[in-house]
Curated annotation (Swiss-Prot):
Disulfide bonds: none annotated. It comes from Salmonella typhimurium (strain LT2 / SGSC1412 / ATCC 700720). GO terms for molecular function: ATP binding; magnesium ion binding; phenylalanine-tRNA ligase activity; tRNA binding. This is Phenylalanine--tRNA ligase alpha subunit. Its main location: cytoplasm. The keyword ATP-binding applies. Tetramer of two alpha and two beta subunits. The lineage of its organism: Bacteria, Pseudomonadati, Pseudomonadota, Gammaproteobacteria, Enterobacterales. Binds 2 magnesium ions per tetramer.
Length: 327
């Protein structure tokens, strides 16, 4: 047992001399490893009489436990010293500004949609939605555009088959709403629409918003007043606005609305008109009792005018240098 005490003393000395965790682990292997000095002491038990083996084994285990505790304590000291050394080596200038958090931002077209929804929401309009894969009845026929009508050719439609298509306008939402509920109706219908066209001012997919009111005694004066208020609110200017006679199959009379630009030229911003009696009849609403007005506008077009963007395609190219300007 005197030899055992000597081993413990030697282990303690080696532990205290270990300068880092790696050196300490070498001491652990030397004394407590599979072939370590203290581990091999267990093999001497077979040379003892059976009645002495339990007591001798307990002494060896106590010695191993003593060394293990010394190893744990020294390891904690070394790890703490290493941490303190790293912290001391680090220099932090607390006068430097913190790292800026990169906040996200809304896409400019989304900003436009939200702004318009907010304005019309205050006038009592609700937001209505519908499918982007539409049938020709809701996209054309019910809107007074039968199969032989030349206006169908103007839409550059993406067809799936003879009756299914990617909607070219959100007017189908108006048809579905009027079929589902009786007047009074007051909705706006924002959403993606699709036309086979691509250049500086057109993309195959773009965003449109249409508005619809159907009630008794709705007149063109109501339409003009609503759109005057909207355009001046949207552009935040006392704009000069004009209504030009135009033609749309689903409204009569129809008009296109222009605003005076900063360059002294008129800029087209939207189309509108009184809901055609045929459209009301197609959805089961009596045009002798009810009347209404509708309007439609391109979200990208309005966004370009509001922010001075010259190329429509910029909205879809995901260029962060462009998008960050609207944060």
């Amino acid at each position: 047992m005197s030899h055992l005490a000597e081993l413990v003393a030697n282990a303690a000395a080696a532990i205290n001399q270990a300068s880092d965790v790696a050196a300490l682990d070498n001491v652990r292997v030397e004394y407590l490893g599979k072939k370590g000095h203290l581990t091999l002491q267990m093999t001497t038990l077979r040379d003892l009489p059976p009645e002495e083996r339990p007591a001798a084994g307990a002494v060896i285990n106590a010695a191993k436990e003593q060394v293990q505790q010394a190893l744990n304590a020294r390891k904690a000291e070394l790890e703490s010293a290493a941490l303190n050394a790293r912290l001391a080596a680090e220099t932090i200038d607390i006068s430097l500004p913190g790292r800026r958090i990169e906040n996200g931002g809304l896409h400019p077209v989304t900003r436009t949609i939200d702004r318009i929804e907010s304005f019309f929401g205050e006038l009592g309009f609700t937001v209505a939605t519908g499918p982007e894969i539409e049938d020709d009845y809701h996209n054309f026929d019910a809107l007074n555009i039968p199969g032989h009508h030349p206006a169908r050719a103007d839409h550059d439609t993406f067809w799936f088959d003879a009756t299914r298509l990617l909607r070219t306008q959100t007017s189908g939402v108006q048809i579905r709403t009027m079929k589902a509920q009786q007047p009074p109706i007051r909705i706006i219908a924002p959403g993606r629409v699709y036309r086979n066209d691509y250049d500086q001012t057109h993309t195959p997919m773009f965003h449109q918003m249409e508005g619809l009111i159907v009630d008794t005694n709705i007149s063109f004066t109501n339409l003009k007043g609503t759109l005057h208020d909207f355009l001046r609110n949207f552009f935040e200017e006392d704009l000069q606005i004009r209504f030009r006679p135009s033609y749309f199959p689903f409204t009569e009379p129809s008009a296109e609305v222009d605003v005076m630009g900063k360059n002294g030229k008129w800029l087209e911003v939207l189309g509108c008109g009184m809901v055609h009696p045929n459209v009301l009849r197609n959805v089961g609403i009596d045009p002798e009792i009810y009347s209404g007005f509708a309007f439609g506008m391109g979200m990208e077009r309005l966004t370009m005018l509001r922010y001075g963007v010259t190329d429509l395609r910029s909205f879809f190219e995901n260029d962060l240098r462009f998008l960050k300007q609207f944060k």
